[in-house]
């Protein structure tokens, strides 16, 4: 079923339908489309297009559909729907009948897809930040281990001056830190909600778009409807960040491929990231790194293609913009995969310190030290530079290093050279003298490692904030608990009960907005139940439920509670949190009395699970 058709007297040619349909790739926006639809149903309720009963019925069906998609997203591909919006509407109508046809009131696929895409970009962007953080952390850890490992530094792929392996690692940590900053900035700019912009001129209904934006977790609503549906800057910006970061990954890969080669022998990659040859049994090829280098062009191509697509589009929406997704999905997936592989390459890396030191001593890498020595003796640098160049030629002719020339030979190039010259020609001296901020002296490298470690530790990579509930949260908690109770998901709780138990509630929040809640319900000194767990639409599947449950587990431990239990229709979630299934018949009678409040008490489909805190404490003591 198409979302359009009254204007047409003939069906679309099947070849055109295949050409036009986008479900084969935009199915990845299913969860975002459903979340956006839930928020839109609330907006329609606020302007009396939907009754409260209708909105709750739609939301229940959409949440049910969301769970089905989470379990098997590829089921969508069996449909002949035009796009993900059509598919969601078809499924919704299948669940609630003609009521599902009311949901699109005041909404266009133009603002719908713009919202879906921003929701997806925001979620994917946060995962990419975690990927960058993981890679940087891995490299800093390697740097800590190799602060004293001398490595030849190169210019023009010729040995130039000695550095350390830690200093080399930290150079890429700096590059990835700029990528992290760029990505964070891009996510801030895209954090505006287009929903309610309609096809191009805005919705005809008096929707509170700021409230709508807040419901979806956006910083604010977009300010211009025409721009809202035309804007794909965020797509290009994310792909631009990906392209720059892939450039850094490619340079990293190239360095490591060279260092791993038989000619260098500086590092050895683990078997886990290398492959062999079908003909030559001795080969151990750095395929992971070569693929990182090779996939860089693929990401560049996606960015170039996207920019070519939008460069001459008139406002507002045009079908060309359907081409924004495949390149975006592929570019960000590729970037994420390459970061993961790069981190994996560092996980098992072996550095041959003897070989790197030997290489650093070759190539007259201490020539600049000799020039600086002459400058200290009063010779102008340009003249000193020339003298050392002649000395290098002489050493090459002798087949030896500068420090292997006799004092008499060195004095033949400049009479100011004295016996103390040999002290400054050592590798240790070469490193020690580079003591300005950012240099390779041991002190500066140690400082740089320490500072990098501090920056990473201070970085807020936690997407989920959980805190104790406050009295100021009462209205929100009452609304959340009532909502999930009306859907039959949780037991109802009165306002007075929530106020009484406020100290046992925990909430998740984003930028001050409460996005979920749960509480402990204590039966006696040794037993407690997790109740009223619910996460707002738009914030599910982002770790909030897990974080809230873990918070309550920790709180229960602090309160010396011996056992937690939960009654739920989502046992898989709690099994992942290390709960184990138990029989409801084993629960105390006073627990089961509370089931009298449950709207499903006569057709109970809840599963009982428990978490034995006393066993956890005992196992921790044994480990200690």
Swiss-Prot record:
Coiled coil: none
Organism: Vibrio vulnificus (strain YJ016)
Family: In the N-terminal section; belongs to the lyase 1 family. Argininosuccinate lyase subfamily.
InterPro entries: Acyl_CoA_acyltransferase, Arg_succ_lyase_C, Argininosuccinate_lyase, ASAL_AGS_AcTrfase, Fumarase/histidase_N, Fumarate_lyase_CS, Fumarate_lyase_fam, Fumarate_lyase_N
Record region (Probable acetyltransferase): 467-624
GO molecular function terms noted in the UniProt entry: acyltransferase activity, transferring groups other than amino-acyl groups; argininosuccinate lyase activity
Keyword Calcium recorded: no
HAMAP family xrefs: Arg_succ_lyase
Subcellular location: Cytoplasm
Enzyme Commission code: 4.3.2.1, 2.3.1.-
Gene3D superfamilies listed in its UniProt record: 3.40.630.30, Fumarase/aspartase (C-terminal domain) (1.10.40.30), Fumarase/aspartase (Central domain) (1.20.200.10), Fumarase/aspartase (N-terminal domain) (1.10.275.10)
GO biological process: arginine biosynthetic process via ornithine; L-arginine biosynthetic process
Pathway annotation: Amino-acid biosynthesis; L-arginine biosynthesis; L-arginine from L-ornithine and carbamoyl phosphate: step 3/3
PANTHER family documented for this protein: ARGININOSUCCINATE LYASE
Catalytic activity: 2-(N(omega)-L-arginino)succinate = fumarate + L-arginine
Primary localization: cytoplasm
CDD domains in the cross-refs: Argininosuccinate_lyase, NAT_SF
N-acetyltransferase domain ranges (all copies): 464-614
Protein name listed in UniProt: Bifunctional protein ArgH
One GO CC term on file: cytosol
């Amino acid at each position: 079923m198409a979302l359009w058709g009254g204007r047409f007297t003939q069906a679309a040619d099947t070849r055109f339908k295949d050409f036009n349909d986008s479900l084969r790739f935009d199915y990845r926006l299913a969860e975002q489309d459903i979340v956006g639809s839930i928020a839109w149903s609330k907006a329609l309720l606020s302007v009396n297009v939907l009754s409260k009963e209708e909105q709750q019925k739609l939301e229940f069906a959409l949440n049910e559909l969301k769970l089905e998609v989470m379990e098997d997203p590829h089921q969508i591909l069996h449909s002949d729907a035009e796009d993900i919006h059509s598919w969601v509407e078809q499924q919704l109508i299948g669940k609630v009948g003609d009521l599902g046809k009311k949901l699109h009131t005041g909404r266009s696929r133009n603002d719908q897809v713009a919202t879906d895409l921003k929701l997806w970009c925001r979620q994917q962007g946060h995962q990419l930040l975690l990927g960058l953080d993981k890679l940087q952390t891995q490299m800093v850890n390697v740097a800590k281990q190799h602060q004293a490992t001398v490595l030849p530094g190169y210019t023009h792929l010729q040995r130039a001056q000695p550095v350390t392996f830690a200093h080399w690692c930290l150079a890429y940590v700096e590059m990835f830190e700029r990528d992290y900053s760029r990505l964070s900035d891009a996510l801030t700019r895209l954090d505006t909600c287009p929903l309610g912009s309609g096809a191009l001129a805005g919705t005809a209904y008096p929707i509170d778009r700021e409230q709508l934006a807040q419901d979806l977790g956006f910083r604010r609503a977009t300010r211009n409807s025409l721009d809202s549906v035309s804007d794909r800057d965020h797509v290009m910006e994310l792909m631009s960040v990906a392209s720059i970061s892939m450039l850094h990954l490619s340079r990293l890969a190239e360095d490591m491929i060279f260092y791993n080669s038989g000619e260098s022998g500086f590092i050895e990659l683990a078997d886990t990231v290398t492959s062999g040859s079908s003909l030559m049994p001795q080969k151990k090829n750095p395929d992971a790194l070569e693929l990182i280098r090779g996939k860089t062009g693929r990401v560049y191509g996606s960015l170039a293609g996207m920019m070519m697509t939008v460069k001459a589009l008139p406002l507002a929406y045009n079908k060309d913009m359907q081409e924004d997704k495949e390149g975006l999905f592929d570019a960000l997936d590729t970037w994420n995969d390459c970061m993961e592989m790069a981190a994996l390459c560092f996980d098992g890396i072996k550095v041959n310190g003897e070989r790197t030191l030997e290489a650093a001593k070759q190539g007259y890498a201490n020539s600049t030290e000799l020039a600086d020595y002459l400058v200290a003796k009063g010779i102008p640098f340009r003249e000193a530079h020339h003298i050392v160049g002649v000395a290098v030629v002489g050493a090459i002719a002798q087949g030896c290093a500068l420090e292997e020339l006799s004092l008499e030979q060195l004095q033949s190039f400049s009479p100011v050279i004295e016996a103390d010259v040999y002290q400054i020609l050592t590798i240790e001296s070469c490193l020690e003298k580079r003591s300005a901020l950012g240099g390779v002296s041991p002190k500066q490298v140690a400082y740089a490692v320490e500072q990098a470690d501090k920056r990473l530790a201070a970085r807020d990579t936690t997407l989920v904030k959980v805190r104790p509930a406050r009295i100021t949260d009462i209205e929100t908690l009452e609304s959340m608990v009532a909502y999930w109770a009306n859907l039959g998901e949780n037991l109802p709780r009165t306002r007075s009960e929530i106020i009484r138990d406020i100290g046992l509630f925990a909430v998740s929040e984003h930028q001050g907005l409460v996005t979920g809640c749960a509480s402990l319900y204590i039966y006696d000194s040794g037993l407690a139940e997790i109740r009223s767990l619910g996460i707002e639409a738009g914030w599910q599947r982002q770790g909030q439920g897990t974080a809230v449950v873990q918070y309550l587990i920790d709180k229960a431990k602090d309160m010396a509670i011996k056992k937690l239990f939960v009654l739920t229709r989502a046992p898989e979630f709690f099994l992942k949190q290390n709960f184990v299934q138990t029989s409801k018949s084993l629960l105390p009678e006073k627990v089961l009395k509370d089931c009298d409040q449950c709207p499903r008490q006569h057709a109970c489909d809840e599963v009982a699970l428990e978490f034995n805190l006393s066993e956890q404490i005992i196992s921790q003591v044994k480990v200690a």
